[in-house]
């Protein structure tokens, strides 16, 4: 492989973007971060984060996803564009697509995905619409003939694993656990740093071109029942388990006001329907741990040991 691709990251100060930015720098890519001037000049945590990225060699480019001229200028200087924008800006990624199309030299675009594979979900509203917006962005990329990689990284460990998927908790429960469905759907939990690493590994890899990169890591793919049993073994205690049948989950989604019901509907897709693992990875997909066996990812077992 020749020189490493120059990467433009849009959304570098966000929840997952910061890990992708760090991985890009750590793996030696010339890294450009598109940020609003107001973010860079503030005294916020995000501004401090940008300073640390600058110290590690990142190039800060002022601009915005809503400013076409600044997007075009930023895209001109790179080979690969990675978007990690948040849910409110998913639809605005059509602006990135326009800029990439206009410049015409980008070798790969990674739109903001980093969750379930939106082409393989059985979600109910309002999650259904959330996934459909991401799918719409995919179709726009394909229609313009822009080379792409979609990263399906499944569950963020920091959201779902550290709490054993319990709403409102920041550490695994030690008394009672609520399990949606029968607890047998297999789910994939991935540490955010590892999502960053696998994403950047894919940037210059021809095997991931015009494919979905699935992070279906064998040591991190387990059911909620298996996860709870693993935790119980670690703390040498049996938790009280409350199972919520699907009908009750659907009623809860219907009775909970928007937007609070989005997270419940996403959990229904993951933990009841099993949408992260209920399909085979076909020819349009590749699996990260098979492509990059050298990446020593944090296992679920190791992750939970930090909370004992």
Curated annotation (Swiss-Prot):
GO BP terms: lignan biosynthetic process
InterPro entries in the record: NAD(P)-bd_dom_sf, NmrA-like, NmrA-type/Isoflavone_red_sf, PCBER-like
Keywords, ordered alphabetically: NADP, Oxidoreductase
GO molecular function, one term: oxidoreductase activity, acting on NAD(P)H, oxygen as acceptor
The enzyme's E.C. designation: 1.23.1.-
Enzyme class, broadest EC rank: oxidoreductase
Domain of life: Eukaryota
Catalyzed chemical reaction(s): (-)-dehydrodiconiferyl alcohol + NADPH + H(+) = (S)-isodihydrodehydrodiconiferyl alcohol + NADP(+); (+)-dehydrodiconiferyl alcohol + NADPH + H(+) = (R)-isodihydrodehydrodiconiferyl alcohol + NADP(+); (2R,3S)-dihydrodehydrodiconiferyl alcohol + NADPH + H(+) = (S)-tetrahydrodehydrodiconiferyl alcohol + NADP(+); (2S,3R)-dihydrodehydrodiconiferyl alcohol + NADPH + H(+) = (R)-tetrahydrodehydrodiconiferyl alcohol + NADP(+)
Active site: 134 (proton acceptor)
Binding site residues for NADP(+): 11-17, 36, 46, 138
Function noted in UniProt: Oxidoreductase involved in lignan biosynthesis. Catalyzes the NADPH-dependent reduction of phenylcoumaran benzylic ethers. Converts dehydrodiconiferyl alcohol (DDC) to isodihydrodehydrodiconiferyl alcohol (IDDDC), and dihydrodehydrodiconiferyl alcohol (DDDC) to tetrahydrodehydrodiconiferyl alcohol (TDDC).
Family, as annotated: Belongs to the NmrA-type oxidoreductase family. Isoflavone reductase subfamily.
PANTHER family: ISOFLAVONE REDUCTASE HOMOLOG P3-RELATED, PINORESINOL REDUCTASE-RELATED
Name of the protein: Phenylcoumaran benzylic ether reductase PT1
Natural source organism: Pinus taeda (Loblolly pine)
